[in-house]
Amino acid sequence: MPQKNAQDRLWKILTPVLLVLAVLAMAKTLFVGLEIDEEYAFSLGFRLVKGDRLFYTMWEPHQLSALPAALVLALYTAIAGTTTGALLFVRAVVLVCKAAMSAVFYRDFKQTIGRHGALLSAVVLFVYTPKWFLGPDYISQQFHFTVAAFLCFYHYYTHGFRRPWLVVLGAVCVCFSFLAFPQSALAAAVIFIGMVLLGRRGKEPTICKIPRGAVLFVLGCMACAAAFLAYVLPGMGLTVFLQRVSLILNDPQYDFTTSQRLALLASQALNTAKFLAKPLAASVVLCLLWWAKTRQKRDWIGLALNLWAILAALLCVVRAVADSSSDERYFMPALVLAAAWAFRKGRGTVREPLFWLGFLPGMAAYAFILRSTLLGFSATFMYLTWPALCGCFAMLARRQMEPEQEKLPQGQCVLAALLVFLLVCRFWCVLVTGWKPANVATANLKQITAGPAAGTWADEKAANMQMALYEALEPFAGKQVLQAIGEQHGLGFMMAGGTLTIGQASVISGTDSDPRFIQYYEELPEKRPDVILYDEAEVRDMAAFHAWIEENFTITARYPVTHGTAHLQVLVVD
């Protein structure tokens, strides 16, 4: 009892401290930093707001993630009548949604994993975003809609199969997750199997001898698919739709085979293994010394795995500070292995729904994402965060249900190490264009005073570019714009108060001259631009596309726009 009272007193102090730190960290993220991936998410949504159509006039590889961003941007433009300041608004909406999700998590899990564990977990969920920014890009949507779907399913299966509408709502959320990253749709099969097993073991009411939740899940997904096709197909037809899908799937950036992808991953895995070997060795040595001293009978493998994850996470904290990089997630494989171990002997316990509805679908999604993404091996670890967190919840649940077997708060310690990593990266690192290392001490931050990013602070290069885009495009209200630039500036399309339209096949960054750019204007002549932008500091090979532009468009005027380090060239088209 005295020990419990001491823990309660400690948590009375820790609770407000954690909440204040989390709020301050996310407030910094709300106002500071800008990266082109976040801009890309905004420009996708803006295309829908301005009347572009999925697959028909949008040839984007990630266009299926455009719907949520479009809804929020449409709301803002309807209220404000402009896109000025839209970045802050959308970030704030995402932040409010994250806070609500964390609150729901705490409410539903405080009995299962304890109040303190639920609080720590909720704070981690609030502070975490896959790419650190708050903009609703496709990776962030895949994570957050997955969590939202899980919360719906988990409540239904752990509260006596009441409120079946939650399964339908969860199906809608999971469909948005699949739209954001279609390769993760394999998780649907795992979720269905889990629902059938959980339903039969829990004596759930059935429909046609199939557990009700599984049936509602399938019907909900089918309804979403039908609604999506009803939205996309009118005016285009199935034949054109399939042609567009084939065209987009043949994106030159993704032109690699499974064997080529596996070979690349294998070559990169060695560096991760070298990094993880040190904390693993330290964990094994510490556990052996502990065992030699106490000779206790306990789960030494689980303890070693958890200690490995903790040490690896703390080592990543040191690297993040030293390198000023928030991309130090090498600890995640260790955390996933510790998570997998936490689910052993979980059948019939409160851990079972966590396994079937959270951990296993997350691992299935990761397997297919790993094959299809362009990211390097260590960068893909962000997709392991959700299954890893489910394992942490399982550790907390086991200790809550079996306090005599699990006296050490291992789950809390693992989550605490993860939270330290997240908070250090949030406070110390600054997002800059190109994911280059930067921190609050060295980044030359400037306030952006005009355009959709008005009111935020970014590194000097990004801030200057936003102001140059504003100055270059302000005279062209209502015109159609083409950025013939390899590194696209998505917020540039939202200049001139949101009156511009987008006149190009794709707004994704990182592409060299692509023959589909030319095909786009041949098939859709109405998308020919009125104004074209070049970047004098072009980092991609756009020579072929620029040559085609000069030959096929009548350029009536050409002039430079410079703002600090940003140098644009404006071409006016007849």
Report the location of each language-model feature:
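Short hydrophobic alpha-helices at membrane interfaces in multi-pass membrane enzymes
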Residues: 152-176, 207-219, 304-306, 354-360
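Short hydrophobic/aromatic helix or loop-helix immediately within or flanking a transmembrane segment
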Residues: 42-48, 57-82, 177
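Membrane-interface alpha helices of multi-pass inner-membrane proteins
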Residues: 130, 165-182, 188-193, 223, ...
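Perimembrane helix-loop-helix junctions
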Residues: 158, 187-225, 258-259, 289-295
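Membrane-interface transmembrane helices that cradle and orient dolichyl/undecaprenyl
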Residues: 111-115, 147-167, 340-351
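Transmembrane-helix signature of polytopic, membrane-embedded enzymes
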Residues: 100-127
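Short periplasmic/luminal acceptor-recognition loop of GT-C membrane glycosyltransferases, typified by
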Residues: 60, 188, 427-509, 530-540, ...
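Short acidic/glycine- and proline-prone juxtamembrane loop motifs at membrane-interface regions
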Residues: 134-143
